Amino acid sequence: MKKQDLIDMEGIVTESLPNAMFRVCLDNGCQVLTHISGKIRRNYIRILPGDRVRVELSPYDLTKGRIIYRLRNKYPNGISQEVFRSMRD
């Protein structure tokens, strides 16, 4: 599959699962099961619930994806977790 066939979306990590898997809530409201790309794994980038990430989806299966980038936090320390918790409730 070519790189241009993939769909890029942004979302928030809602849950950390075993084996470096994460559940991500996309901006359109869909829940996606994702894993970490090789570059993130090699560079030891830590991804936690509440982090904003860029996800790459295959057009063949829109329920699974790959986290390709962790976006910078727009808020001061601690506020993003509060926003995340209020969003979940």
Curated annotation (Swiss-Prot):
Chain ranges of the S1-like domain: 1-72
Keywords on record: Chloroplast, Initiation factor, Plastid, Protein biosynthesis, RNA-binding, rRNA-binding
Chief location: plastid
Molecular function terms from GO: ribosome binding; rRNA binding; translation initiation factor activity
Compartments it resides in: Plastid, Chloroplast
InterPro entries listed in its UniProt record: NA-bd_OB-fold, RNA-binding_domain_S1_IF1, S1_domain, TIF_IF1
Family membership noted in the UniProt record: Belongs to the IF-1 family.
Function: One of the essential components for the initiation of protein synthesis. Stabilizes the binding of IF-2 and IF-3 on the 30S subunit to which N-formylmethionyl-tRNA(fMet) subsequently binds. Helps modulate mRNA selection, yielding the 30S pre-initiation complex (PIC). Upon addition of the 50S ribosomal subunit IF-1, IF-2 and IF-3 are released leaving the mature 70S translation initiation complex.
UniProt cross-references to PANTHER family, sorted A to Z: TRANSLATION INITIATION FACTOR IF-1, CHLOROPLASTIC (PTHR33370:SF1)
Subunit description: Component of the 30S ribosomal translation pre-initiation complex which assembles on the 30S ribosome in the order IF-2 and IF-3, IF-1 and N-formylmethionyl-tRNA(fMet); mRNA recruitment can occur at any time during PIC assembly.
Name of the protein: Translation initiation factor IF-1, chloroplastic
Record organism: Angiopteris evecta (Mule's foot fern)
